[in-house]
Amino acid sequence: IFAAYAFITQVFIIMISGLNVFKPYVVNSFLLAMGTFIVLALLYLVLTVLVAKFVTTKTAPKWMLSIGVVLILATVTGNIFALLLGISLIQKTRTKDASAIEKWQKLWQKILRNTMALHGLFFIVFMFSLSVVSSWTFDYDFATKNNYAELLQSPSLEYPLGTDDYGRDLFSRIVFGAQISLIVGFFATIIPGVVGGVLGAISGYYGKRTDNIIMRLLDVLYAIPGILL
């Protein structure tokens, strides 16, 4: 099912990115990116058939190991389903411990049985992938530069969601806004994790006194209202 959803996600990316052909011009990387997306979509479609034919719940042919590596590399486009499929194939071709594979299968079976959870996961992966590849297929100028000749345009093929009162393409603004939100969210998650890990390592290494000092400093920090921070 990962292969099928990787294919569907890629098709949606191609459809959304393809709307840029109706604009006056496209970015230099547009044709190369779209060609790559089409190749990946065909790969996922072929894999959907191959996985259904050759892969069982616990095993996969040895020759699928290289395909798993390619799928992991393809995750650079943000298609998390490709990553999950790649991990699953590598695990089934290399792992001899059936219990480890069963744990992985049970984890995803619980999610896949829940239709709403699966649809939510698809939407998240789609938005993530679109945010990742938007720099290759969308022109940033349409989202930021004022175009007074195109003020408040109604939705059309050229401007799927119309333009604002400065003539900027609302569709492009939403796509790049999602990209910025993704970057901010990523660093907002990573930085506290790194800082917390470093402080935890220091307190564990130097012992109780250092741990108490760090905890009291953090208590002072937590006492400050978040809006001031």
Q: Where are the model-predicted features located?
A:
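Generic hydrophobic transmembrane alpha-helix motif, especially the helices
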Residues: T93, I214-L229
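Juxtamembrane "helix-exit" motif on the non-cytosolic side of transmembrane helices
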Residues: F12-V26, V51-T56
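Transmembrane alpha-helix signature in integral membrane proteins
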Residues: A41-Y44, L170-Y205
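Alpha-helical transmembrane segments of polytopic membrane proteins
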Residues: N28-L42
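Periplasmic/extracellular loop-to-transmembrane helix junction in inner-membrane transport proteins
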Residues: P24-V27, L107-K110, T144-F186
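Hydrophobic, aromatic-rich membrane-embedded alpha-helical segments
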Residues: S66-S88
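N-terminal signal-anchor/first transmembrane alpha helix
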Residues: I1-Q10, I38-A52, G68-L71, A82, ...
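Transmembrane-helix boundary motif in ABC transporter permease subunits
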Residues: F54-K58, V133-T137, F187-L218
